């Protein structure tokens, strides 16, 4: 779930596909839903798994792209919680500042 700057809590879920690479994790569906509902600024993200698993690399990149520096609370069903920032999850993140403007490309 993600908490928006306005205090609204928005949830998501893991969407499985028989073609595993097309599966979309709950972190991404949560953020995509929030964006689709018009939210663009977030206070925190909570990731709940059975065993306290950390977000995958794709989710870490999307969290960084859409949230920048927010706390990410990772928890399991027994009550264990670990809080990291987006940059701790994805140090030296690749983002739009690493992209050259199109007009500078030799295309």
Regions found by a protein language model. Give the residues of each.
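Compact, glycine-rich, soluble single-domain proteins
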Residues: 13-29
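Hydrophobic "anchor" residues
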Residues: 8-9, 81
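General beta-strand structural signal in soluble alpha/beta enzymes
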Residues: 11-12, 74
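C-terminal binding/interaction regions
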Residues: 37-107
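Short beta-strand scaffold segments in enzyme catalytic cores
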Residues: 1-8
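Short, charged low-complexity linear segments at domain edges
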Residues: 24-43
């Amino acid at each position: 779930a993600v908490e928006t700057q306005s205090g609204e809590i928005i949830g998501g879920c893991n969407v499985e596909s028989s073609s595993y690479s097309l599966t979309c994790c709950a972190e991404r569906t949560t953020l995509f839903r929030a964006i689709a509902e018009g939210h663009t600024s977030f206070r925190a993200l909570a990731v709940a798994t059975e065993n306290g698993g950390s977000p995958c690399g794709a989710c870490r990149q999307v969290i960084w792209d859409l949230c920048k520096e927010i706390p990410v609370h990772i928890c399991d069903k027994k009550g264990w919680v670990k809080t990291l920032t987006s940059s701790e999850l994805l140090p030296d993140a690749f983002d739009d500042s690493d992209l050259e403007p199109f007009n500078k490309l030799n295309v």
